[in-house]
From Swiss-Prot:
<comment type="subunit">
    <text>Tetramer of two alpha and two beta chains.</text>
</comment>
<comment type="similarity">
    <text>Belongs to the TrpA family.</text>
</comment>
<keyword id="KW-0822">Tryptophan biosynthesis</keyword>
<dbReference type="InterPro" id="IPR018204">
    <property type="entry name" value="Trp_synthase_alpha_AS"/>
</dbReference>
<feature type="active site" description="Proton acceptor">
    <location>
        <position position="50"/>
    </location>
</feature>
<comment type="pathway">
    <text>Amino-acid biosynthesis; L-tryptophan biosynthesis; L-tryptophan from chorismate: step 5/5.</text>
</comment>
<keyword id="KW-0028">Amino-acid biosynthesis</keyword>
<dbReference type="InterPro" id="IPR013785">
    <property type="entry name" value="Aldolase_TIM"/>
</dbReference>
<protein>
    <recommendedName>
        <fullName>Tryptophan synthase alpha chain</fullName>
        <ecNumber>4.2.1.20</ecNumber>
    </recommendedName>
</protein>
<dbReference type="GO" id="GO:0005829">
    <property type="term" value="C:cytosol"/>
</dbReference>
<dbReference type="InterPro" id="IPR002028">
    <property type="entry name" value="Trp_synthase_suA"/>
</dbReference>
<feature type="active site" description="Proton acceptor">
    <location>
        <position position="61"/>
    </location>
</feature>
<dbReference type="Pfam" id="PF00290">
    <property type="entry name" value="Trp_syntA"/>
</dbReference>
<comment type="function">
    <text>The alpha subunit is responsible for the aldol cleavage of indoleglycerol phosphate to indole and glyceraldehyde 3-phosphate.</text>
</comment>
<dbReference type="GO" id="GO:0004834">
    <property type="term" value="F:tryptophan synthase activity"/>
</dbReference>
<keyword id="KW-0456">Lyase</keyword>
<keyword id="KW-0057">Aromatic amino acid biosynthesis</keyword>
Length: 263
């Protein structure tokens, strides 16, 4: 059975479209609202959804995502709650879902148990931003048994290091467009093309750019270099607005539709 991620990128290639990948922190402001946001995202044209697993020490997350992570953890959110939420969401949502979660929380849950439970609840893969290179093979070996994808995350670094990180990549490659934490930025370094060329030389798996894309205009600029754009902080900024939940969910949907139109 092919992984949903591969099928989605095949379909997008056929349509000559780039993937729209929004991020949302699980369980913020609460699990019920996250479910509604995910359903709204698919309706508004998202091609794949990235679900953040809140963690107490999120090294790669900017302030916006950190606020939602600590909010969800303060509500007592556990990984099991996220798994159950995905099971529920899967009754409506057909597009691929990947987790974004730190190695510490995966390891604490139990590596194989985490992969098995994730797959069974309807998750197709995970981005582990702090996965050590030396752990990669062991993690991938277990994931392969379950047709679960470990999505590599690369930053503009040496060609040699990029090659090691993306070796044997499956699904897509998460290309961080700037060195540093996530967040909303207005300008993105103009050497993106050279950087994506280096990644493309190392792997022919689809490349998606994330970290700092905050508007349809920026997404449009980025799309010529990659196969998809990932938008996190700009979405969570809306989720964190002090407005009624129904209105917030509608605003998230509108924002995703606007980005989707330019892709």
């Amino acid at each position: 059975m092919a992984n949903k991620i591969d099928l989605k990128f095949k379909e997008l290639k056929y349509k000559n479209k780039k993937a729209m990948i929004p991020f949302v922190t699980s369980g913020y402001p609460d699990v019920e609202t996250t479910k509604k946001i995910v359903i709204e995202m698919e309706k508004s044209g998202a091609d794949l959804i990235e679900l953040g697993i809140p963690y107490s020490d999120p090294v790669a997350d900017g302030p916006i995502i950190q606020i939602s992570s600590s909010g969800a953890l303060n509500n007592g959110l556990k990984i099991k709650d996220i798994m159950n939420m995905v099971k529920e969401v899967r009754k409506n949502v057909k597009i691929p879902i990947v987790y974004m979660g730190y190695f510490g929380c995966v390891f604490k849950y139990g590596l194989e148990k985490f992969i098995k439970d994730s797959k069974e609840s309807g998750v197709d893969g995970i981005v582990i931003p702090d996965l050590p290179l030396e752990e990669r093979e062991r993690v991938k070996e277990i994931a392969d048994r379950y047709e679960f994808y470990i999505i590599p995350l690369v930053a503009p670094t040496s060609e040699d290091r990029i090659g090691k990180i993306v070796n044997g990549a499956k699904g897509f490659i998460y290309c961080v467009s700037t060195n540093g934490v996530t967040g909303v930025r207005n300008i993105i370094a103009n050497d993106v093309k050279a950087y994506i060329d280096v990644v493309s030389k190392a792997s022919n798996v689809p490349k998606c750019i994330g970290f700092g894309i905050s508007s349809p205009e920026m997404a449009q600029k980025m799309k010529e270099y990659c196969d998809g754009v990932i938008i996190g902080s700009a979405v969570m900024k809306i989720v964190e607005e002090d407005i009624p939940k129904e209105e917030m969910i509608r605003k998230v949907g509108e924002f995703i539709s606007q980005v989707n139109e330019v892709l």
